[in-house]
UniProtKB/Swiss-Prot annotation:
Molecular-function GO terms, alphabetical: translation release factor activity, codon specific
Residues carrying N5-methylglutamine: 233
Region forming the signal peptide: none
Protein name: Peptide chain release factor 1
InterPro entries associated with the record: PCRF, Pep_chain_release_fac_I, Pep_chain_release_fac_I_sf, Prokaryotic/Mito_RF, RF-1
Lineage start: Bacteria, Pseudomonadati, Pseudomonadota, Alphaproteobacteria, Rickettsiales
PANTHER family named in the record: LD18447P
GO CC annotations on file: cytoplasm
Length: 355
């Protein structure tokens, strides 16, 4: 089907849905039609803008052919034609991006997990830096950042930490953060001034609701034990810590941050549900397009995606060859938008090559 025919078909569908909604339908039929109508609004607005520019260009070209035009009028028409010819490719691209298949998870809130990787205590300190960076970014975006669990080293580092980030389209903005983040800096304990390299792993999961993932009680094994602190000492005398295993997948979540077993269980179930949902989402994504696994958006957690070089004051994203020489703004202030927007644009460009 030609591009223009496809656009006409979408406009017809939008008009028919509008007529249907105004005809007095009720119940599930109304809900379904309303959802479809709302989903088409953005792309229809872009199609209309594109069609309007095409129509204006055709009119301008026809007017230019008329006999007896003075030089001033002719120059004005040629300027208009030049402007329209330059805007059409951009408008067409905007339409194609709006037509790209949507990831159902993009509109969801997210759970972020940061784990120290290679590099010992320095890696744990870097994991804490990353976790705080995402907290600052969430604050800048007006999202709600709720710490779910932190396993600290006792001297400021995090062995692992997780948080729930709630807001509009959180997952669509943060999903490209999944992967291995590397840091190069001189540790405070380094007397010779040598640069050390360490790493931390970030996983971003779409936060799943109960309607997304139904977990049967029979599929869970729940173990309780006494919470322990740094060095293994017990921090309370009740079995408040919880370990939940989803038997069909083998996915396990352990939590001991809260003094209440009930609260630990609720948080652990939230993380478990997100991990199961993400696993199912990844399988579907792989089935849809194996060829896209290697590109930005694959979220491969073994992939080294970004380096933070403190001596040089730079942050480099290796997937899109983008380097920013403002490490403090990025790390301390959470100013991640330049990376986020560039990664989204790169992902859209690669998807456009497939249609």
């Amino acid at each position: 089907m030609r591009f223009s025919d496809n656009l006409a078909k979408i406009l017809d569908k939008y008009e028919n849905l509008g007529n249907k909604l105004s005809s007095g339908i009720m119940g599930d039929e109304f809900v379904k039609a309303s959802k479809e109508y709302a989903e088409l609004e953005d792309v229809v607005a872009k199609i209309k803008e594109y069609n309007k520019a095409k129509s204006e260009l055709e009119e301008a070209n026809n007017f230019k052919l008329e006999v007896g035009l003075d030089n001033a009028t002719l120059e004005m028409i040629e300027d208009e034609i030049y402007t329209l010819e330059n805007s059409l490719p951009k408008l067409e691209r905007a339409v194609k991006i709006a037509l790209l298949p949507k990831d159902d998870a993009d509109s969801k809130s997210a759970i972020i997990e940061v784990r120290a990787g290679s590099g010992g205590e320095e890696a744990a300190l870097f994991a804490a830096v990353l976790f705080n960076m995402y907290q600052r970014y969430a604050e800048l975006k007006g999202w709600h950042f709720e710490i779910l669990a932190i396993s600290d080293t006792g001297i400021g580092g995090y062995k692992e930490a997780s948080a729930s980030i709630k807001g509009k389209d959180v997952f669509s903005k943060l999903k490209f953060e999944s992967g291995v983040h590397r840091v190069q800096r001189v540790p405070e304990t380094e007397s010779q001034g040598r640069i050390h390299t360490s790493a931390a792993t970030v996983a971003v999961l779409p936060e799943a609701e109960e309607v997304d993932i139904k977990i049967e009680d029979k599929d869970l094994r729940i173990d309780t034990y006494r919470a322990s602190g740094a060095g293994g000492q017990h921090v309370n005398t009740t079995d408040s810590a919880v370990r939940i295993t989803h038997i069909p997948t083998g996915i396990t979540v352990a939590l001991q941050d809260e003094k209440s077993q009930h609260k630990n269980k609720a948080k652990a179930l939230k993380i478990l549900r997100a991990r199961i949902y993400e696993e199912e989402r990844r399988k579907k994504e792989q089935e849809r397009a194996d060829s896209r696994r290697g590109q930005v958006g694959s979220g491969d957690r073994s992939e080294r995606i970004r380096t933070y070089n403190f001596p040089q004051g730079r942050v480099s994203d290796h997937r899109i060859n983008l380097t920013l020489y403002k490490i403090d703004e990025v790390v301390k202030n959470g100013q991640l938008d330049e990376f986020v927007e560039a990664l989204i644009a790169d992902d859209e460009a690669k998807k456009l090559l497939e249609i």
